[in-house]
Amino acid sequence: MNGTEGPFFYIPMVNTTGIVRSPYEYPQYYLVNPAAYAILGAYMFFLIIVGFPVNFMTLYVTLEHKKLRTPLNYILLNLAVADLFMVIGGFTTTMYTSMHGYFVLGRLGCNLEGFFATLGGMISLWSLAVLAIERWVVVCKPISNFRFGENHAIMGVSLTWGMALACTVPPLVGWSRYIPEGMQCSCGIDYYTRAEGFNNESFVLYMFFCHFTIPLTIIFFCYGRLLCAVKEAAAAQQESETTQRAEREVTRMVIIMVIGFLVCWLPYASVAWFIFTHQGSEFGPLFMTIPAFFAKSSSIYNPMIYICMNKQFRHCMITTLFCGKNPFEGEEEGASSTKTEASSASSVSPA
């Protein structure tokens, strides 16, 4: 084994020289240069000062403007809540522990940080899947005369929380566990060991199938069908200028959504799967640290992609920031036609 396993931790370094110490009790500067911990802390600080205001503003603006309280925006609000969980429960903890060079908060702190960070990520991931289903049902109309209403939105939000808790609670009660990972300043699921009594293997397989493969398949299927529906609608209308413009807008949004999802989650999931299937192989602390913090950056990507590209929300946000006035009123009105065009394209069912 090319690492050192201890009670509730795994250090990616063989303890041949006797310098490996518990990440709950001693600084881990023997793993990487101390400057790396300072960089990690600065990165966490950046995510906090950007992620918290953007997601908090999303909640505040939606509550402030009644016209934004639509069923679809329930899911978008759920995304903001998930991101705030990650910011408050995960990023602040990681920033604090990186300043000390080890997980100074102990086992309880590791469980809490791992739980809240993973919970936020899972709620976010399943919210994206529910959004994909909503877009598919509304645009492609696989169910005739179906309207996405408040009850459907509440069911979608409940589903995201139920699935997220089904993934994050088991490690707290003995099915797998949360341990420090990477530079040992943040905690995650134990992909690294086959510790007796925790059944890590079965939990990781369950998590990857139910909480990564399934939502990823849903997202690709729904957005794939959405693109086909828009193209078929454009062909049926002989590719009018209005439809072409709407098609480009929807296509751009879908591409950004999928790329954002993959950038955030695929590197982390791929590395975690590699570590799980190659337990005992040699890898450095940065091997898991870098993709883990790509995933954490989703707290910024989500509101930018799913909220700030919404013209109506952007107008309300600017109005709120400027105390009831929108200094860019003319520009917003000039862009409103695109929104109408996209809506008209969405109302055409595929041939």
From Swiss-Prot:
One of its GO terms (biological process) is visual perception. InterPro entries: GPCR_opsins, GPCR_Rhodpsn, GPCR_Rhodpsn_7TM, Opsin, Retinal_BS, Rhodopsin, Rhodopsin_N. It is found in: Membrane; Cell projection, Cilium, Photoreceptor outer segment. The keyword Lipoprotein applies. Residues 335-351 have a biased composition (Low complexity). Pfam families: 7tm_1, Rhodopsin_N. The chain crosses the membrane at residues 37-61, 74-96, 111-133, 153-173, 203-224, 253-274, 287-308. SUPFAM superfamilies: Family A G protein-coupled receptor-like. One of its GO terms (cellular component) is membrane. GO terms for molecular function: 11-cis retinal binding; G protein-coupled photoreceptor activity. PANTHER family: OPSIN (PTHR24240). This is Rhodopsin. It comes from Sargocentron diadema (Crown squirrelfish).
